[in-house]
Each structure stands twice: as structure tokens, then as C-alpha cells.
Amino acid sequence: MAASSKLASKISGPWQSHDMAALSEIVGYCDSHLRLGEIQDYENALNGLQLENSGQVTKIASAVDFSSRGLEECAKRGANLLIVHHGMFWPGLRPVTKALRRQLELAFENNIAVYSAHLPLDLHPQLGNNAQLAAALGLKSNQPFFEEKGQLIGVKARVSLPRDELDRKLQRALSGPVKAFMFGPKKTGTIGIITGGAGSEIYKVAQEGIDTFITGEAPHWAAVAADELGMNLLLGGHYATEVFGVKALAAHLSKRFKVPWAFIDCPTGM
């Protein structure tokens, strides 16, 4: 995905309702539905409720990343629950100064709770980033694949599809450019999807019989590896491939708890 010179943000989603739900009920449901207690993740993910508010939710916002920009948009729209994929602690331990201090001020001043789900939202069979992207591409009979921290996080599908057609479908699904390194078959045999930054796993992916690999970003050497392995490698951008899960989860919660939701779009260009 082409790099962007600056961050941009915009809002999408319905905001009409004025109903209310208990934060504890939403959190409990998410923890159970996403199986947080069963799924291992990176330490800095700290999945679940990361910051509480006063206890009530009237509007839900979702975003890929926890950021000042996202919190500012929450405040503008009166949202008091922010659901993210990369949470408050993703950068690791930091002193509460500068950016982190500003983020916490925004959250406290505007009564915003923060809930984060990383791998649990990547691998969920209905709401997950991988399942949602596969659905957006029209892929069916998907199977889980690629073990990470004891669970299968990606999806794969056996489908014969011209690789150029898949490239076009991916561009439409992501509403943006795709970097395509076409060294594999002109018609796909098995497509593997792992959203985000999984390009460095290309050798492991190849061992699972994948001839066409879709992910968000990859190191430089992965393009060389794709050539050596005879694979098609399609990079849609880390951010662009991971908008699906937070959108799907927020929409699901909106329907279940009768509160409105919106997606806060803050593309990073990566």
C-alpha cells in the first residue's frame, strides 16, 4: 500500500440511537465471544478492557489503532467506548508523558472506555479480520491455517481464480492499492490470508501448500522469497487489511446492545 504523507481521519457509521448499555455487560460479552481466556497473544496486546469509563455506553466507536486522533473523534461524536485492534500498551512500557499523557487526558475528560482485541479478533471465524477479508473477496469454504501462539490465526481457501482478477478484487475490497509480486501460478490453487504484518512468515506459509499469499506488509526480502518459492504475494497494507475486524465487532455489538456505532478511519499509510 502506498505510504501516506500524513494521517487522515474520517467517520463512518450510524449515530441515530440514544439507547444505553452497561459497559460491564459489553465487556463480559466481548471477553466470552472472542474467547479471550483461551487465546494466547503478545504481552503488549493486553486484550480486553484497558481503560474503564463511568460504566455506561451510549455510543461505540471502533478504530484500528489507539491514538489521540481517534480519541478526539470519539469526543466529537460523543462516543464513550472505543474498540481497537492495537491497544494502549502496544508500544510497550512508557512513562506517562507527552503522547500518552495527552491520550489519557482525552479519555478521562470525555469518559471514554477502551477495549482492545488483537489475535482474538484476527482469528474469530465470523468477526475476525481474516474471515471478513475472505468474505469480502467472495472466498468460501475457508479453513483455518497457520499456527501462532498455539492457535490457527489465518484462513485458506482452495479456489481456482486468475491471479490478476484476485488482485483487482483485493483492491476493491480494500479501497486502495495493492503491491503484487506475481511469481506463482497464473491461476490460484490455494489462497492464504493473514492480515497485518505477516509477510515475514512467507516460508512457513509456503510449507502449508499456499501458492497465493495475501497479507498487509512484508520485509524487502519477502519479495525475493516469493520469487524463489514460486508464490504470488499480495500486500494490501497493514492498516487496510485490519479495518475489518473492529468494524464487524462494533456492528455486532451495536445490534446486540442497541447502541449506535461508527468506524473512525485514521489510515497510517502502512
Enumerate the predicted regions with their spans.
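Low-acidity, Ser/Thr- and Arg-rich intrinsically disordered low-complexity segments
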Residues: 4-5, 9-12
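Active-site catalytic microenvironments in core metabolic enzymes, especially phosphate/sugar-handling
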Residues: 11, 15-270
